Amino acid sequence: MTRRILIIDDEEDIREVAGLSLETVAGWEVVLADSGAQGLARAAEHQPDAILLDVMMPGMDGPTTFRELRKNPITSHIPVILLTAKVQSTDQKRFADLGVEAVLFKPFDPLTLSTQISAELGWE
């Protein structure tokens, strides 16, 4: 089954590396967004199987974007994995309290990114 993943990250390099990894290694369809607002629109339009969401973005950050996704009945069911460069113990609790499916860390290994996502979401 071909999966569709939405990657929401303000860093072009991260979007490109993650997108290329998921397309070539896993054969998944990838949709890209460079901001929380664009991500909300693309999530509603493309109905991805999961969303990889950066925590630190200008404007609408990852946690705010996540809450907005959950408010919309069209996107409220989509699993979300946060992507972050740094996590302190207070952040881990905050992310767990949000209700995200998982948190992955930058830098990630492009060769194992799809395996990590599949494991976190029980797609194996």
State where each predicted segment sits.
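Two-component/phosphorelay signaling modules centered on CheY-like receiver
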Residues: 12-31
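His-Asp phosphorelay/catalytic-motif detector in bacterial-type signaling
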Residues: 47-49, 74-79
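C-terminal output helix
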Residues: 108-117
